[in-house]
């Protein structure tokens, strides 16, 4: 821990915004993980729901949606209660899908910003540190001293910035992939429900 604190101070003032970025990445990752876990109805639900609708077992599909957690299951269960016909259901599904996708994308832009910003902050810290290292001169001989050590310390900021960026990139890629899977499952369920409504003549 003491060595970590020592490196932190050697990295310069830019280490503070990098620390804030790393804390933000961890906080966003935890919040998004819990949100996705709560809102994801799961691929098995989507597959079973579509299978039941294609088999014209609409009541069983409705009961499955009612008994399943997650936003996708809730939306299709609510849509099945609409009695005005297919067009009303379609409008409801589209509006709810837009709201849900916006919720899924929430805070992911922050991770993307940190991916780009962290290496730049690290580079800035390194440049400032190198300027400081090259400005040190031995007043007696006129020769620069401690330049190598100064550059080594300055590179701490770049290394830290890259680590934060990699962490943020991994988190962003994971949640973007999971979001794509959830959207795909949702679209499959919506299509199956609308096809079932078409077959029923509503």
Listing of model-derived features with the role each one plays in the protein:
Residues 39-124, 128-139, 171-202:
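Predominantly long cytosolic amphipathic alpha-helical stalk/bundle segments
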Residues 17-30, 114-124, 160-164:
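Lipid-exposed faces of alpha-helical membrane segments in multi-pass integral membrane proteins
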């Amino acid at each position: 821990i003491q060595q970590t604190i020592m490196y932190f101070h050697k990295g310069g003032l830019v280490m503070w915004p990098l620390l804030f970025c790393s804390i933000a990445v961890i906080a966003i990752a935890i919040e998004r993980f819990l949100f996705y876990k709560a809102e994801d109805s799961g691929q098995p639900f989507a597959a079973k729901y579509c299978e039941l609708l294609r088999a014209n077992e609409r009541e069983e599909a409705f009961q499955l949606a009612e008994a399943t957690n997650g936003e996708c299951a809730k939306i299709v269960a609510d849509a099945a209660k609409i009695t005005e016909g297919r067009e009303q259901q379609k409008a409801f599904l589209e509006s709810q899908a837009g709201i849900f996708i916006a919720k899924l994308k929430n805070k992911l832009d922050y991770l993307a910003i940190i991916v780009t910003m962290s290496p730049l902050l690290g580079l800035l810290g390194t440049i400032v540190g190198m300027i400081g290292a090259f400005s040190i001169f031995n007043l007696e001989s006129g020769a620069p001293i401690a330049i190598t050590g100064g550059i080594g310390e300055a590179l701490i900021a770049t290394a830290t910035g890259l680590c934060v960026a990699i962490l943020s990139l991994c988190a962003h890629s994971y949640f973007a992939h999971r979001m794509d899977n959830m959207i795909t499952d949702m679209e499959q369920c919506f299509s199956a429900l609308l096809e079932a409504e078409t077959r029923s003549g509503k």
